[in-house]
């Protein structure tokens, strides 16, 4: 009869579940850490750009809010990074956001927007050609411009040239489906807000209002789709 020595019972060490997961899936966990660090870098860069843009707008006498600009810049960068990863579309969305932010503040200040903003959006649209398709972009931009030029002619100056230039450039970037949806969404938000605001402030409905901020909201919303 062979007597085997009795080995002492040793309880396994208590390991933090997070550490255990990291050890078991170290490759995935490491990639996640790297991704988070990259997102933080993108958000930080966006925050710095937002700060510089805000200073530039202040020097030009624009209506602006530093806190809003910095928070919106950071949130937009994180949101786009979560949606598209660290792809070219994330950076396209970030720069589109800054262009629309600049256009919105300019519109709120004196109802004008420099032509270089819409031209910059058109240049940024080149990134969309492989995924959206140039035909869709061209149709969307043309339809948007035609509709809004007609509205401009019928409104007697109530619908500004900057409005249709910015929105048509955005529709061109997004393609006809998403672009026109963003335009309609932005216009709808703008009309509802203006009706409520004019009612509260007892403001004349015939007075003009800044439309580009609402168009920007609609366009950035559908950019995530």
Write out the residue ranges for each language-model feature:
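A membrane-topology feature that recognizes alpha-helical transmembrane segments
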Residues: 1-225
């Amino acid at each position: 009869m062979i007597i085997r020595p009795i080995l002492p019972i040793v309880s396994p060490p208590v390991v933090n579940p997070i550490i255990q997961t990291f050890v078991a899936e170290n490759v995935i966990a490491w990639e996640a850490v790297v991704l988070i660090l990259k997102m933080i870098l993108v958000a930080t860069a966006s925050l710095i750009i937002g700060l510089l843009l805000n200073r530039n707008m202040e020097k030009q006498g624009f209506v602006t809010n530093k806190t809003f600009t910095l928070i919106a810049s950071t949130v937009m960068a994180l949101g786009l990074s979560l949606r598209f990863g660290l792809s070219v579309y994330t950076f396209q969305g970030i720069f589109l956001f800054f262009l629309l932010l600049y256009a919105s503040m300019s519109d709120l200040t004196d109802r004008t927007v420099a032509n270089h903003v819409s031209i910059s959006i058109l240049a940024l649209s080149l990134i969309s050609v492989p995924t959206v398709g140039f035909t869709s972009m061209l149709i969307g931009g043309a339809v948007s411009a035609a509709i809004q030029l007609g509205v401009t002619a019928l409104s007697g100056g109530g619908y500004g040239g900057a409005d249709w230039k910015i929105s048509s450039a955005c529709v061109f970037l997004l393609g006809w489906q998403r672009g026109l949806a963003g335009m309609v969404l932005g216009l709808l938000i703008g009309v509802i807000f203006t009706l409520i605001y004019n009612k509260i402030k007892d403001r004349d409905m015939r007075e003009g209002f800044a439309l580009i901020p609402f168009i920007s909201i609609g366009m950035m919303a559908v950019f995530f789709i």
